[in-house]
Swiss-Prot record:
Name by which UniProt lists this protein: Probable cinnamyl alcohol dehydrogenase
Tagged with keyword GTP-binding: no
Highest taxon in the source lineage: Eukaryota
Annotated family: Belongs to the zinc-containing alcohol dehydrogenase family.
Binding site for NADP(+): 49, 166, 187-192, 210-215, 250, 274, 297-299
Residues noted as binding Zn(2+) 2 in the record, renumbered to the chain: C100, C103, C106, C114
Species whose genome carries this gene: Eucalyptus botryoides (Southern mahogany)
GO molecular function: cinnamyl-alcohol dehydrogenase activity; coniferyl-alcohol dehydrogenase activity; zinc ion binding
Enzyme class: oxidoreductase
Gene3D superfamilies: Medium-chain alcohol dehydrogenases, catalytic domain, NAD(P)-binding Rossmann-like Domain
Record lineage: Eukaryota, Viridiplantae, Streptophyta, Embryophyta, Tracheophyta
Cofactor binding note from Swiss-Prot or TrEMBL: Binds 2 Zn(2+) ions per subunit.
Length: 355
């Protein structure tokens, strides 16, 4: 084993400016310490939030930026205090790679809500080095922010790491895990299609809600949804009033909330998971008169991610993906912006030429 104190270099694909165009970029990895893993990246999913970051949609981007937070890799080296992982293990890591370890969320296994969390890219680590993501040959991650990938789950299924736990966590936290509930999925993209699969596996009746009819066959026949509702169909929306216990709103652009609040039963929950950098509006009687809630949820903890992966393994759930090489990544990002993917791009990093 080599020295864990030495710096290493790796090559990733980085955005240099808000154009969001990625190209090869060689940089130093942060020093690895006693609790760290040095990981060879095998594959990395592409999430819509990656587009927000590389194009500076949120006004917080720093360049050069190597995106990618749905990462599966092979452990090449472990620090002296690493206890859960060994060289050769297949592991996954996500969007959070650091936290304060002392606040309420950290002490209750909800580190993704720590106010001092460190993002896996477009942030600065405790040693002052910029963090960079999974569109790269290697990464260094602390053992607290890594999970073991179950045997039988393909490495390319790393999209489950983000999309899967984004729906699994709120279903568990909001007491919506029991069978027999009626749920809605607004938006049939990467998160939405996993929402259908996970909710169905929990025994829920699932309605997909979309702006057009073009995904009806896919939703009902391929993903197993029970019903399909077009939001512009006034009669259909009216008939569905007060019919759902919850709705996952995965839409990442500004849209009205009131039509969907009307679909919720008494005490129903509208759960926001799409990143929107603009105000959303509704009139208060829409929630008051049905004791309804508009809430949000952000990915899931590492503990919940482990639970979700085991749940997916047990139920045989996988993400529907399109595997690409790194030299196609810019085209894939353009297609993702147009919603032209079913339902998640995954980069075969280990099989790609990076330089």
């Amino acid at each position: 084993m080599g020295s864990l104190e030495k710096e290493r270099t790796t090559t990733g694909w980085a955005a240099r400016d808000p154009s969001g165009v990625l190209s090869p970029y060689t940089y130093s990895l942060r020093n690895t310490g006693p609790e760290d893993l040095y990981i060879k990246v095998l594959s990395c999913g592409i999430c819509h939030s990656d587009i927000h970051q590389i194009k500076n949609d949120l006004g917080m981007s720093h360049y050069p930026m190597v995106p990618g937070h749905e990462v599966v890799g092979e452990v090449l080296e472990v620090g002296s205090e690493v206890t859960k992982y060994r060289v050769g293990d297949r592991v996954g890591t996500g969007i959070v790679v650091g936290c304060c370890r002392s606040c309420g969320p950290c002490n209750s296994d909800q580190e993704q809500y720590c106010n001092k969390k460190i993002w896996n890219y477009n942030d600065v680590y405790t040693d002052g080095k910029p963090t960079q993501g999974g569109f790269a040959g290697e990464i260094v991650v602390g053992q607290r922010f890594v999970v073991k990938i179950p045997d039988g789950l393909e490495s390319e299924q790393d999209a489950v790491m983000c999309a899967g736990v984004t729906v699994y966590s709120p279903l568990v936290r909001f007491g919506l895990k029991q069978s027999g509930l009626r749920g809605g999925i607004l938006g049939l993209g990467g998160v939405g299609h996993m929402g259908v699969k996970i909710a169905k596996a929990m025994g829920h009746h699932v309605t997909v809600i979309s702006s057009s009819d073009k995904k009806r066959t896919e939703a009902l026949e391929h993903l197993g949804a029970d019903a399909y509702l077009v939001s512009s169909d006034e009669n259909g929306m009216k008939e569905a009033t007060d019919s759902l216990d919850y709705i996952f709103d995965t839409i990442p652009v500004v849209h009205p909330l009131e039509p969907y609040l009307a679909l919720l039963k008494l005490d129903g929950k509208l759960i926001l998971t799409g990143v929107i950098n603009a105000p959303l509006q509704f009139i208060s009687p829409m929630v008051m008169l049905g004791r309804k809630s508009i809430t949000g949820s952000f990915i899931g903890s590492m503990k919940e991610t482990e639970e979700m992966l085991e749940f997916c393994k047990e139920k045989g759930l996988t993400s529907q993906i399109e595997v690409i090489k790194m030299d196609y990544v810019n085209t894939a990002l353009e297609r993702l912006e147009k919603n032209d993917v079913r339902y998640r791009f995954v980069v075969d990093v280990a099989g790609s030429k990076l330089d």
